[in-house]
Curated annotation (Swiss-Prot):
PANTHER family with a match to the protein in the record: HISTONE H2B (PTHR23428)
Residue numbers of Phosphoserine PTMs: 15
Location, primary (coarse class): nucleus
Protein's name according to its UniProt entry: Histone H2B 1.1
Family: Belongs to the histone H2B family.
Gene Ontology MF term list: DNA binding; protein heterodimerization activity; structural constituent of chromatin
């Protein structure tokens, strides 16, 4: 006799959707598909900047769309740059150039410096 399906614990605020098993008519279990999102990362940054501020699900959805859009723009531009230079690999140099081309003035400078800092931290941790 099959055991009854146990529901997964409630996800933390801003985390991915919990995977729960649902019963079909024929008794087989089917997993819900996971929805990938930047929500947990947006939430972590929000708490670093404004610890006492929350975010609505609609605002989180907008932030998720924004991050996806910026990611696609940078990836597309970096891909174009690699293609122009007859390269098959997108390196940090292509990403940096794409950021300089896409973001305006001071924002590009800050993004490049933060990116360089992140790459340095990553390589030193290896």
């Amino acid at each position: 006799m099959p055991e009854p399906a146990k529901s997964a614990p409630a996800p933390k605020k801003g985390s991915k959707k919990a995977v729960t098993k649902t019963q079909k008519k024929d008794g087989k279990k089917r997993r819900k598909s996971r929805k990938e999102s930047y929500a947990i990362y947006v939430y972590k940054v929000l708490k670093q900047v404004h610890p006492d501020t929350g975010i609505s699900s609609k605002a989180m959805s907008i932030m998720n769309s924004f991050v996806n859009d910026v990611f696609e723009r940078i990836a597309g531009e970096a891909s174009r740059l690699a293609h122009y230079n007859k390269r098959s690999t997108i390196t940090s140099r292509e990403i940096q150039t794409a950021v300089r081309l896409l973001l305006p003035g001071e924002l590009a400078k800050h993004a490049v410096s933060e990116g360089t800092k992140a790459v340095t931290k990553y390589t030193s941790a290896k």
